[in-house]
Amino acid sequence: MFELVITPRVSETDLAGHINNTTLPVWFEAARAPIFQLFHPRQDYRNWKMVIVKSTLEFKKQIYYGTNVVIRTWVKNIGNASLVLHEELYQEGSLCAVNEAVYVNFNLKTQEAEMIPLHIRNELLLHFYEDNDLRSLNGLN
């Protein structure tokens, strides 16, 4: 599991007094930085390969300014050229949002998906998603 703590900013708060719903996709992307680092250790954007093809965000509770949030990211599935990420956002210990993101290892020059290299696949497996019952036993919920 990857974990990122984010301090909500005043500018991310909307007129209803909570964090605007357009902010969460940006936060979830920020939490994926360690995964991007696996695919792009030198951060060479000319050879970027991680292309998002789907993101499904479910809001569970409102999120507020003034209290840090914690985003936890797991690898849910690894295909030949794609991976599915499971992401959860917590504030004060409460689950506030769940996101699932699908990425493809895509070669922008050839415009084709490429197989995820074995060394990256092995590293991703270290962060594999456990089902909710096992996570509760481990104190992650």
List each language-model region with its residue ranges.
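Terminal targeting signals and extreme-terminal segments of soluble enzymes
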Residues: M1-V70, K76-N141
